[in-house]
Amino acid sequence: MLLTISDFLFLSLTFSRYARMRDSRPWSDRKNNYSGPQFTYPPEKAPPEKLIKWNNEGSPIFEMPAEGGHIEP
């Protein structure tokens, strides 16, 4: 059976020899991967640089702070 270039590209893109490898570590070693906290704290929010107000037509109006300061939300 002859493989064309398109067949070779299809096979190389759809099947990976690393996709379904068995984990050879014992269960006690694998279990240690999932111990401990499973979350991180959220990052601090950046302060807003402009204030957005909406007019009666539904269009936004952007107001910039004076002297490069930050606007409190």
Swiss-Prot record:
Primary subcellular site in the record, as a coarse category: secreted
Keyword Hydrolase: no
GO biological process: defense response to bacterium; defense response to fungus; killing of cells of another organism
Subcellular localization(s) per the UniProt record: Secreted
This protein's GO CC annotations: extracellular region
Residues of the signal peptide: 1-14
Record carries keyword DNA repair: no
Region ranges (Disordered): 25-48
Keywords annotated in UniProt: Antibiotic, Antimicrobial, Cytolysis, Fungicide, Hemolysis, Secreted, Signal
Function: Displays antimicrobial activity against the Gram-positive bacterium S.aureus ATCC 2592, the Gram-negative bacteria E.coli ATCC 25922 and P.aeruginosa ATCC 27853, and the fungus C.albicans ATCC 2002. Displays stronger activity against P.aeruginosa and S.aureus than E.coli. Displays very weak hemolytic activity.
Protein name, as recorded: Antimicrobial peptide lumbricin-PG
Organism: Metaphire guillelmi
